[in-house]
């Protein structure tokens, strides 16, 4: 069923949990995925905005950073084509509470998965939940050691 979606192949390649999803879950994930474009310099996510969703970068570059009270920023990590931006939907993870900013450093094309649907899948499917928390832990680990 999900194979008829234009995004199914891309999602299947990007997410190691794809084969652990039921056909209905695959179809739901595809149905609530949409292409997005961010121009160079655009704000993708901030603590003041609603939850963007999970971003699968097709091309371009995003920078994730924190802002200090005096306005200085600290880059946490950068994401490139083929990578998944999980913290653009940190609202789906109860254990993650961070005032994160994400900007497009280059024109960026991505697929955006609805935060609400991803949250539902995390609640229903342990493979999705493990993937989300593992990817978050890897991002923070990379930040600590670079």
Where are these regions (language model features)?
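Short, Lys/Arg-enriched, Trp-marked, Pro/Gly-tolerant hinge/linker segments that flank
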Residues: 143-146
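Cyclic nucleotide-binding regulatory domains
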Residues: 43-105
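Short low-complexity stretches enriched in small and charged residues
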Residues: 9-21, 32-35, 57-70, 115-119
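Cyclic-nucleotide recognition modules
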Residues: 78-141
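Alpha-helical structural elements of signaling/regulatory helical domains
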Residues: 21, 71, 124-128
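Compositionally biased, intrinsically disordered low-complexity regions enriched in proline and serine
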Residues: 39, 66, 132-134
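Cyclic nucleotide-binding regulatory module and flanking cytosolic helices
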Residues: 1-39, 89-92
């Amino acid at each position: 069923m999900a194979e008829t979606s234009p995004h199914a192949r891309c999602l299947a390649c990007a997410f190691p949990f794809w084969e652990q999803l039921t056909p209905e879950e695959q179809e739901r994930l595809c149905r609530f995925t949409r292409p997005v474009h961010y121009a160079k310099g655009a704000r993708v996510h901030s603590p003041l905005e609603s939850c963007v969703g999970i971003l699968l970068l097709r091309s371009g570059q995003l920078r994730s950073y924190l802002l200090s009270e005096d306005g200085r920023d600290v880059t946490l990590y950068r994401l490139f084509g083929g990578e998944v931006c999980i913290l653009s939907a940190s609202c789906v993870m109860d254990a993650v509470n961070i005032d994160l900013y994400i900007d497009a450093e280059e024109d960026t094309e991505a697929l955006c998965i609805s935060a609400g649907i991803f949250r539902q899948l995390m609640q229903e499917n342990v493979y999705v939940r493990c993937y989300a928390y593992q990817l978050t832990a890897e991002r923070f680990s990379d930040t600590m050691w670079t």
